[in-house]
Regions:
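A surface-exposed partner-binding patch
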Residues: 1-70, 109-111
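Compact, glycine/acidic-enriched structural inserts
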Residues: 87-109
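Intrinsically disordered, low-complexity regulatory segments enriched in Ser/Thr/Pro
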Residues: 75-87
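Charged, low-complexity surface segments at secondary-structure and domain boundaries
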Residues: 1-5, 84-90
Length: 111
């Protein structure tokens, strides 16, 4: 897998996460209901939800129901969230410094 496989440069730690996750199924974060998509699903999910139209600077990487998680294209490793029904109208909210921090925060909240 190349860092620019999706037409932009993936953040370092997210790229590392994708190369380590060898499965074709989404990465389920504990029992939280949050999944991070496998690399094979990323383009399809972004096309399905028309992310390029509503939030062209962001790339969908996972979700829990209507709540979606994103990275910013050609940017740092920050993870953002937004409601899929509010894309383009509500500002993205930063929720973690990187994908590993995000996973750890979710797992800690489950305890």
């Amino acid at each position: 897998m190349k860092r620019n496989e999706f037409g932009f440069v993936l953040p370092n730690l997210y790229y590392q996460f994708l190369t380590e996750w060898k499965e074709t199924d989404p990465y389920e974060i504990g029992d939280s209901g949050i999944c991070l998509y496998a690399k094979e699903d990323l383009l399809e999910r972004n096309e399905t939800y028309q992310i390029e139209v509503d939030e062209p600077d962001f790339f969908l990487i996972g979700q829990e129901g209507d709540l979606a998680y994103f990275i910013k294209k050609n940017a740092d490793d920050s993870i953002y969230e937004n409601d899929l029904g509010a894309l383009g109208s509500l500002e993205m909210q930063k929720v973690a410094a990187n994908v590993y921090d995000f996973i750890n925060k979710i797992l800690e909240e489950e305890l």
